[in-house]
Structures are given as C-alpha cells and as structure tokens.
Amino acid sequence: MAQTKSSYDYEDLLACARGELFGPGNAQLPAPPMLMFDRITEVSAEGGEFGKGFIRAELDIKPDLWFFPCHFIGDPVMPGCLGLDALWQMTGFFLGWLGEPGKGRAISTGEVKFSGMVTPAVKTVEYGVDLKRVMRGRLVLGIGDGWLKADGETIYRASDLRVGLFKQES
C-alpha cells in the first residue's frame, strides 16, 4: 500500500524495521545499529534532479556511535560503506513507500566518490537520493544517484544506486 506521509520520525523507521510499515513480506529497513539514519525528512514521487522522485534523510552524529571506537582506534571515522548502505536503505524505503511489493536488496552501484570523512566532530549527516528510474517487472528495480553531506558539505557521491524488491516464490 502506497504511503501518503512525506516524512518519518525514528519510531516510524523502527516500525519499518519490524515490517509494520509496508506490510508483511514487503520492504523493511534494517534495525539499529545498521539503520543508518534517524529520520526521513522528505520523500516525494515527483521532483528531484531527474523529476522521478526523491528521498532525504538525516543522521545525528554522536561520539558514542558504535563504529567510532573500532574504525579506527585513535582515529575515529564512519566507514564509507555505511554511508553508501544508507543510500541503498533509502532507495529501498522509497520503493516500499510507493506501494511496491517485495523484500528489498541492494544490487549494485556505479561510481562512488569519497571526498571527506564523517568524524565525531560532525554534528549532522544529510543523505539524498534522486530517483532516475523505477522499473516494474519480475522484480521492482529502483535506480538513483545519491549524496551524503557532513554539516552541509557534500563529501560522498554515488551514481546508479540499484535496489530491487523481490517477491517470494511460493
């Protein structure tokens, strides 16, 4: 079932992780600590860079986040792959939000560029995905370009993020 809300708080995201937002067998977010954002600030089926829809989210950076003590000892940095995973998570959420059925899985991405780091000194990470295409066939496939901003500065870019929703065969 397509959603009508355009923003989601942390409790909504936890409901999605439990499979309660889009219904049984449909798109879910991972549960913490792998849930990589605290809120979805805006989602729309229209607009964005390509006019096919977009989603925006934020993560509040706290020095005690689980990855800082181990990546790296004495030099804490958020792993870049977690920022990339957040963009895949958002793309899957977008497909579920559209009302598309199936369980979400990251498939691939094109080019990824990192030009900065998320350290404990950062206050807020903003994420964005602009959808280029949603294909509906044996699976539902979302393709988009994404970015990550640390305190307003764009430091990650990813092109051609691909997420599929797969229906379970009986």
From Swiss-Prot:
One of its GO terms (biological process) is unsaturated fatty acid biosynthetic process. Pfam families: FabA. Pathway: Lipid metabolism; fatty acid biosynthesis. The active site is at H71. GO terms for cellular component: cytoplasm. The keyword Lyase applies. One of its GO terms (molecular function) is trans-2-decenoyl-acyl-carrier-protein isomerase activity. Its main location: cytoplasm. It comes from the Bacteria. HAMAP family: FabA. Belongs to the thioester dehydratase family. FabA subfamily. Necessary for the introduction of cis unsaturation into fatty acids. Catalyzes the dehydration of (3R)-3-hydroxydecanoyl-ACP to E-(2)-decenoyl-ACP and then its isomerization to Z-(3)-decenoyl-ACP. Can catalyze the dehydratase reaction for beta-hydroxyacyl-ACPs with saturated chain lengths up to 16:0, being most active on intermediate chain length. This is 3-hydroxydecanoyl-[acyl-carrier-protein] dehydratase. It comes from Chelativorans sp. (strain BNC1).
